[in-house]
């Protein structure tokens, strides 16, 4: 069982790494694409927003398809579709084709979270679930961290189209790995040794609507909080803080790598405490304070990279607890649907954020991008504290 669950975790984590590499492909090249494609930051924000609109529209229905058709089959199809989307813009590097590619990539992105978490929930023993979620999320954050140096490096050495080609090749390689290794789960109905009841796929979700709404709002705020830094901080630092592009890109890369290692630490923490709301609130409050320091104090490159690194570690720390909260709210056999619904919050934030942050950059309000990140972090802190208090006030189950 352990070897099969490890194989499952490896495959799902590789796919998650590629999905985040794809998410960050366009944002990583934001400093270069306006000149390369003769477009504004707002137009690029619209392209990123389109990706998220499509993902938001399809993620919940795709979650139902994941539970009905099989998570692994859907995951492999998503990897192929992502490969096609970035291959398209590599072949035809223009803004109209970028928009078309973002539609296809958004459709593929709508599969990843429902499929990944459905596979993990069915194939990982409960006692290892917190660490499994942290490894899976670490892989995604690692994909985000690899995007800036790879995409910017390839684009500067050759041309942006070859960065899109690299993204396409990564998707194809992940698909090939899944084909070669095969399925670690012999029975689609197997759920950690427990057979799902007949008709589980058609069972409606029983999670309270308010719980789903709060979790979706939390995902939205998390997307807005970290998205400002992940996708627009390099352009903001270069434009508004006179930071050289290599130094800004290094600071972002350290932020992303630190986020990934924060996830691993968060996995251990998630298995040792049930006070997930207080952990998240403390981490985001401290992260907001550090970003304020970045805005208000001129920092040399090393100090800037250190500050963003600590910020990244803190924001990564809460990810496994976030995933455990959603799994706890998911009825058995409906993990794909539940994660599909609440993960739309990422896409809602992904629609609002790029257009807002692109607008601020086009208006020369670069510091506004970082101030927005602070505001969304404070809002995230408030939401998780309110949710924690609500959970503590709920009566304990009888017996």
Predicted regions and their residues:
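Cytoplasmic helix-loop-helix junction between adjacent transmembrane helices
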Residues: 101-140
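Cytoplasmic membrane-interface "Motif A"-like loop-to-helix N-cap segments
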Residues: 68-79, 272-284
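Residue-level signature of mid-helix packing/kink "hotspots" within the transmembrane helices
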Residues: 24, 52-60, 144-145, 256-260, ...
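Helix-to-loop junctions at the C-terminal end of transmembrane segments
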Residues: 58-70, 263-275, 361
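Extracytoplasmic gate region of multi-pass secondary transporters
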Residues: 26-27, 210-256, 260
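Helix-loop-helix hairpin linking two adjacent transmembrane segments in secondary transporters
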Residues: 136-186
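C-terminal transmembrane helical hairpin of 12-TM major facilitator-type secondary transporters
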Residues: 276-322
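Conserved MFS/SLC helix-loop-helix module at the cytosolic interface between two early adjacent transmembrane helices
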Residues: 57-93
